[in-house]
Amino acid sequence: MAKDEAKGLLKSEELYKYILETSVYPREPEVLRELRNITHNHPQAGMATAPDAGQLMGMLLNLVNARKTIEVGVFTGYSLLLTALTLPEDGKVIAIDMNRDSYEIGLPVIKKAGVEHKIDFKESEALPALDELLNNKVNEGGFDFAFVDADKLNYWNYHERLIRLIKVGGIIVYDNTLWGGSVAEPDSSTPEWRIEVKKATLELNKKLSADQRVQISQAALGDGITICRRLY
């Protein structure tokens, strides 16, 4: 089974494969397919955004008519490329990641797609980069969409900053909010290396559910995504 197929939370691998082959892959742009295949050979390929989750992201970007977006956590750039392809010609995505080396893997495909000019890559930890954006009052409520796939222990810290950067009616999407399904398992069934992030994810999910500033929807796509729409 392909690595991206392994990201699904559905109990039936055949059903997930059916979804990918019937509804996702036929609509996937060739440059995204190329980057997905390149990433497949990376030792940490499981970090990449699942293509079915990416497909939903593309629809959300279109629904909010996104022009200015933020991406926290880039890896090789599958979701970043998807965003850049979806944005209008004068759109802009601020992409934040500590590891430029992984971004460089996908950069040739991004250039080939002709969308590099839409990307402002910041090699930085996310919190100081977000704080820097907030230092400019013009940025408050100035973004349409954000996607977060980074340090899970800091998701809530990211949320408190992004809620100020995203406009009312804008969207924030968090990846990995079901953490391999472990959020519904007893700790005794969870591998030790998953425990710390599992606890942080459980706390995040509880806080997002209680956050009246956003409308939320949690979906079992990829490794679980939570969609937040800012209400005020």
Swiss-Prot record:
Presence of the UniProt keyword Transferase in the record: yes
PROSITE patterns listed in its UniProt record: SAM_OMT_I (PS51682)
Keyword Nucleotide-binding included in the entry's annotation: no
Protein name: Probable caffeoyl-CoA O-methyltransferase At4g26220
Pathway where this protein functions: Aromatic compound metabolism; phenylpropanoid biosynthesis
Binding site for substrate: 7, 149
Family statement: Belongs to the class I-like SAM-binding methyltransferase superfamily. Cation-dependent O-methyltransferase family. CCoAMT subfamily.
InterPro entries: Cation-dep_OMT, SAM-dependent_MTases_sf, SAM_O-MeTrfase
EC number(s) from the headed UniProt entry: 2.1.1.104
Gene Ontology MF term list: caffeoyl-CoA O-methyltransferase activity; metal ion binding
Taxonomic classification: Eukaryota, Viridiplantae, Streptophyta, Embryophyta, Tracheophyta
Gene Ontology terms: biological process: lignin biosynthetic process; methylation
Source species of the chain: Arabidopsis thaliana (Mouse-ear cress)
Cofactor note: Binds 1 divalent metal cation per subunit.
